Amino acid sequence: SIPSISAAYDARLQSNNQYTTKTSMESIDEDISDKNLSDALYFSRVCSMIQGLELITKFSESENHEISIVEVLENWRGGCIIRSNLLLDLKKEFSENNSFYSLDNIFNYLQQNRAAISKVLQITTKNNIPTPVLSASFNWFNNLTSVDNPSNLIQAQRDFFGRHKVQKVDSSEDINIDWD
């Protein structure tokens, strides 16, 4: 799943939308601090990189290509488009862990900056300013780190439409809910 990358692609497609309305930045009644904005953008960048690398890994596994994420990061770092120090941080983490869900330093960074992106999203949402990539990154991370996430809702929807059973949070028993 690459929600941040998909959101960036969709935003690019929609950038030529003929039905745009203008939102005046002067009408925003609350300032977004430079620090919060910087932290939110970097948060989203980290999420996007992890999602992209995870996509490469899944492709590699499905096609039996033994693609090394560490080598990908080295090649990107040596290129001319992506030369971010983030690549060095990710390379170090992957060299030590080789799993997307064991990148403790990266996930600790994201956890520490969750409040900054949340604040930016509160202000932009309140003022009808679309931030699809920031929103997708924030929701992706919340979904990864939350006990109660949308998969619970998906299970409920499956039970509603096809009686597939759910497990309530206060029970270990699988049940069908009477939705009527």
List each model region and its residues:
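C-terminal amphipathic alpha-helical interaction region
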Residues: 111, 116-180
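C-terminal substrate-binding/catalytic lobe of Rossmann-fold NAD(P)-dependent dehydrogenases
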Residues: 1-124, 131
